């Protein structure tokens, strides 16, 4: 949307060709999980922002790829359904947040106790600014340990935010 509350379309208003597979609820919004035929990958589309839908008789693209997706596990990788490179991230977490971690990533994760105050967990996450915002929302109680490129990106993200407030 523009400041005048008018629609501004991505891709110069060109139509998307999407094979729809699932609806997911995240942060009180429904998202369509669809296979983008042009980009040859799954993407998320907020349902209330979709306009001008047309059905085709073309077969669904991405059927083999969709068979590999476990929807509950898949959705836990994304923060506010924003995409990003999916990576295995090691986090050091304050023990008080065990419930937060299991709520977010499920109970089938491996948790390693470090000491009475902290534990480590490795989770698959789509790294994005929204993920970084989630980490910072716990005021230093969650630390990204690895991979090193994600730690560096997070530090750069924090520097940009700090610079904005100088």
Residue ranges of model-derived segments:
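Core beta-strand-centered patch of the WYL/Sm-like small regulatory domain
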Residues: 1-80, 86-90
